[in-house]
Amino acid sequence: MASELGAGDDGSSTELAKPLYLQYLERALRLDHFLRQTSAIFNRNISSDDSEDGLDDNNPLLPESGDPLIQVKEEPPNSLLGETSGASSSGLLNPYSLNGVLQSESKSDKGNLYNFSKLKKSRKWLKSILLSDESSEADSQSEDNDDEEEELSLSREELHNMLRLHKYKKLHQNKYSKDKELQQYQYYSAGLLSTYDPFYEQQRHLLGPKKKKFKEDKKLKAKLKKVKKKRRRDEEFSSEESPRHHHHQTKVFAKFSHDAPPPGTKKKHLSIEQLNARRRKVWLSIVKKELPKANKQKSSARNLFLTNSRKLAHQCMKEVRRAALQAQKNCKETLPRARRLTKEMLLYWKKYEKVEKEHRKRAEKEALEQRKLDEEMREAKRQQRKLNFLITQTELYAHFMSRKRDMGHDGIQEEILRKLEDSSTQRQIDIGGGVVVNITQEDYDSNHFKAQALKNAENAYHIHQARTRSFDEDAKESRAAALRAADKSGSGFGESYSLANPSIRAGEDIPQPTIFNGKLKGYQLKGMNWLANLYEQGINGILADEMGLGKTVQSIALLAHLAERENIWGPFLIISPASTLNNWHQEFTRFVPKFKVLPYWGNPHDRKVIRRFWSQKTLYTQDAPFHVVITSYQLVVQDVKYFQRVKWQYMVLDEAQALKSSSSVRWKILLQFQCRNRLLLTGTPIQNTMAELWALLHFIMPTLFDSHEEFNEWFSKDIESHAENKSAIDENQLSRLHMILKPFMLRRIKKDVENELSDKIEILTYCQLTSRQKLLYQALKNKISIEDLLQSSMGSTQQAQNTTSSLMNLVMQFRKVCNHPELFERQETWSPFHISLKPYEISKFIYRHGQIRVFNHSRDRWLKVLLSPFAPDYIQQSLFHRKGINEGSCFSFLRFIDVSPAEMANLMLQGLLARWLALFLSLKASYRLHQLRSWAEPDGTSHQSYLRNKDFLLGVDFPLSFPNLCSCPLLKSLVFSSHCKAVSGYSDHVVHQRRSATSSLRCCLLTELPSFLCVASPRVTAVPLDSYCNDRSAEYERGVLKEGGSLAAKQCLLNGAPELATDWLSRRSQFFPEPAGGLLSIRPQNGWSFIRIPGKESLITDSGKLYALDVLLTRLKSQGHRVLIYSQMTRMIDLLEEYMVYRKHTYMRLDGSSKISERRDMVADFQTRNDIFVFLLSTRAGGLGINLTAADTVIFYDSDWNPTVDQQAMDRAHRLGQTKQVTVYRLICKGTIEERILQRAKEKSEIQRMVISGGNFKPDTLKPKEVVSLLLDDEELEKKLRLRQEEKRQQEESNRVKERKRKREKYAEKKKKEDELDGKRRKEGVNLVIPFVPSADNSNLSADGDDSFISVDSAMPSPFSEISISSELHTGSIPPDESSSDMLVIVDDPASSAPQSRATNSPASITGSVSDTVNGISIQEVPAAGRGHSARSRGRPKGSGSTAKGAGKGRSRKSTAGSAAAMAGAKAGAAAASAAAYAAYGYNVSKGISASSPLQTSIVRPAGLADFGPSSASSPLSSPLNKGNNIPGTPKSLHMTSSLASDSLIRKQGKGTNPSGGR
């Protein structure tokens, strides 16, 4: 092969040397010595020491009878590999040496060469091989053969076989390295060549400690010993088979030899000894193996047969025993069955007694409930009269007060007292059944109550007058003492002041006080006169002018009048909400500066300091330390013990609607204060519940109700909810309470008294929900179960109160979504999860020697220098070939673009930075060339004498080339030639004109996506992975890479080019600086940070209301308006604050958390500073008492349930002092719950208007139905109701059909069972009748359900009617279904009332029907009926006589009898309850109650039945064994003698045939 590769084409000696890789390959494949040694070993006879093998002494290496398959070719060494044929005889090695050991060496010397210290049994064969001397002769013989044979070359096929062996070797080496089991043999033979043998240590490390040897291993070793002995014995007897065995061992090596076996190979015959040995071996195997195996099989078959026989015997025994047990069970079943039937009868009668007791209790309970109901009605009537009495008494008191004030006549006193007369003397109640029951009324004397009411009113009036007189006298004495203590004279008023002789008459007009700085309007002056008149008469009042009409000013003017005209300088107590405290203080300071006002608020320490001025000695004069105390409701409750020490001349309660609850602590505390007069100020209409009206009445007239605790008890029962069906009475009482309040209340509205106020315009602004709001709104709506809402709205009153709060929570969720989705679900700041990765460490050795660029150090030289087509030498040779032929050169274009071969090589081989710089330089060159061609002047010649290198560059003249794009402004704005945004598109836009209403449509304008929508951030971020190496050069290289490489590379990355970097450093000194390039010119849409903060634009665009508010505020600010924005939710005000900051609107905020001092300063700043555009207020905190007339626009972001609250809020701007027109905007989301809330607020406003004007009354509480109507649209509610009714109807219909089917199936099943049982009894011939034995414990019951007789002395069954249910139904039937149409028809035959046979076979013949006797039917005895006569009772179908066969069918009707008994008992109980109820009132019932009732029979009982209880022949409560038996009718009356005489006849006929007429 080498000779073929080395042969040249022409055989010349000038051939170049072979490539190095071929030389390396030939040297690596030099295998001659290995092949020679291997062939010598393989061709040597293994058993050469035996003399019987017939070896040839002349040729010891080639046996005579050896197998030629194992002969391996011996090839001479290859001369091309640098060896000669005589290399083996060069004397380097002894030709007769083996493994470097001479043949003459002894075994002891060989043993010193190896380490056999740790050699165990498993490796002893290695020792025998290493110490053997068998290979010396083979080596000498192989050397002789090498000299004799001629040189042979290695064939190609053998080379391929060797390569394949090499491949197999690699494959198995890989398997060895991966398999743990194979790795234990790592030092199997190599350990013998070293001083330390690590084989066993390696094996122990991989396999672990030795496992315990189990018995199986011991057995296996014993078997292995036997096999070895057997093999040894076989080898002794068959020594001739060794060549064949030798052939088998060398089969593995023979397959590498390509010589075919000789065709004529003779088969060797065995000797007799060999055959005997084989025969003996066969017999031994038969005796040792086959015979025990056959014996085992036979014994196992016998055991299996015995086992199966035993199982079969057990099964047969079980079957026989089961049959015997069944027979015994059948024999013993009679007595337990009888006992069971006895127990069932006992349970039946116990159940009967229980049902009877329950019906009796139910009747008593119903009668008791009826009595309770009548008692409640009487109590309600009594309470009604009592309330009428109290209201009449209050009207009389008010009449006395108004008569004194108005000096009127006394003509209406009788009219008031006439209301106590009660014209109704009796009451009729209609009870079911058509019976009218008259209930006697309790005695009521109207004259007595008239006198009592008049007396109480006069006493209360006199007590009030006396209390007022005593208070005035005490105040007079205190004031006189204070005057005497002061060293002053002529203080203005003397001591002659007295309320008994008022100086001002009731009709005289009082002028405005002189100490009041200001001008009162006409209606305000009238209000002050009315208040002064009330004070003179000692009457408390309510000033209820509409908000903004100056209630505060009128109150201050009244106090100034008292100080100026009456010399009453206090002390006055002003109590108001916290939001209006500063307003009261400012108004006092502004209008009456002579008053010393003491603001009582602050922390406990400040209030303690203020209370130092509270001295009783220094009060009541003009020189007192204070005249007026202003405080809040909360502080009054906290410091009540200090306020009760002072006797207040006048107490003014601002926003008096806070006192509407008489059970509150505030109401009770303020009622106990010592004061001469009380004045309540309220701008809202009087509330429309009786309890709230009475609370105001009691507060202004405490003397009238001091002794009447029953009034409180009356309202604590909540009479409105208790008597819902008596609304007419409530309306009458409510109108009377309003009439009582009229003399003590003054109310004016703006449009009636004030024409100077500007108009107020209210505008509803409807907003659309955004997509996010719609999704949230629909999600909330889907979570609501319409059925649950409807069910909760239709529940009881108690359930309605419980569900209203949960429904209101749903309403608040919907309102949050309408206001802003951020209230429901806030968008939080988003940031990815950031982690810091640890740097991975690289060892210094790997860094310096293991990297690819270091490992392949010659790669760059080969690829970039020697083999690269862009090498400068190659480009030069391609352009200038030595033969002068350069037509096919691929680099001929370089001369036309002015690029040298070196520049081309740099572009292609020096990396990306060189190309980038070259591109930058080429763009500059193209720009210069473009300028040169565009602005160069022609030289006058027609053509040039030569062409320049750049004349062939045509790209510069292209219209969209870089120089043209830079120089032309129109080309810069092209789509693909200018810088674009990250995300943009082209859509149509409508452009509106500013000064006209026209608009135009512009198509395909560049549209940028909003920045808050461009959010594409990773979920996890990390610092780029760094490396660390303990090497100085590695750290230097890492630092260079971190800095961006070289300076030029860094400048290109940041600025785009080195020249641009220089310009960037000097940009501040340039007038027109160059735009930045590289990374500095990149501006990401959301910045370089991945943290995403929700934009304020999304805050506006996510809410339809806030978007509408944004547009509205922009317009209002441009027009110079000032705005008040009201909202009920504090979180919504927080969002509005964020919006104001974003839009840069100047604003202020006031809510419930603002302090009192801050509220005063904020209101003052808003009134005085014009730069504040918006005032954010909460509806509850900022809607009371403050003056914000500087604003002319009010915006309600969300509406309140109560329209009065919104009215108060908008009147903060629309009040006295407002000169501009006030515009009120109300933001409403269209199609949502807010529309329905606004509608309800309008309805409520109308109701309040009607109530204050004395109209009808309507409760002011939200019911569940109303809340459900807010949650659902009317159409949706109607649709849901229709669907629900349709589903309910379908469900009822399907249930009815299923019930009918179930009953029919049950009836058919029972019928089938009864027929089967009847047939079985007919076959067995069972027809037993147990004789009648009267007993008291009902023990005469049959065991098998046969005929038995009703004992005479048994308990009387509950009668129901003349025809019982059990006699109507067929045998084994079920209770009748009223909706079923397939039941039996009951025939009422007149002939059935004919005389019947006395001597009938029915056991019930001893009893008779009492109902006919009671109803007046004559009783007579008739002869017995014959065979031809029918023995049917009245109302029974024809052929329904009783037979023994029919009696046998009645034993399976237990449940039917029980249900019949329950129904009959229920009917009887209902009748008894009705009778008992009527009897409780002393009336009898003429009809409507069954004549068989126990009550009726006990009243009208025939004389002939004195010895027997009334028992109906068709009673459903008969014996359960007679259920379904058709019992014929009996005579109307029987005597004891006739019944006893017929006893024997009954017993005789019980065994005979059936009576006539029976089936």
UniProtKB/Swiss-Prot annotation:
Residues 220-232 have a biased composition (Basic residues). The keyword Iron-sulfur does not apply. Residues 1108-1263 form the Helicase C-terminal domain. Keywords: Acetylation, Actin-binding, ATP-binding, Cell cycle, Cell division, Chromosome, Cytoplasm, Cytoskeleton, DNA damage, DNA recombination, DNA repair, DNA-binding, Hydrolase, Microtubule, Mitosis, Nucleotide-binding, Nucleus, Phosphoprotein. The modification N6-acetyllysine is found at K118. It is found in: Cytoplasm; Nucleus; Cytoplasm, Cytoskeleton, Spindle; Chromosome. Signal peptide: none annotated. Activated upon binding to double stranded DNA or nucleosomes. This is Chromatin-remodeling ATPase INO80. It comes from Mus musculus (Mouse).
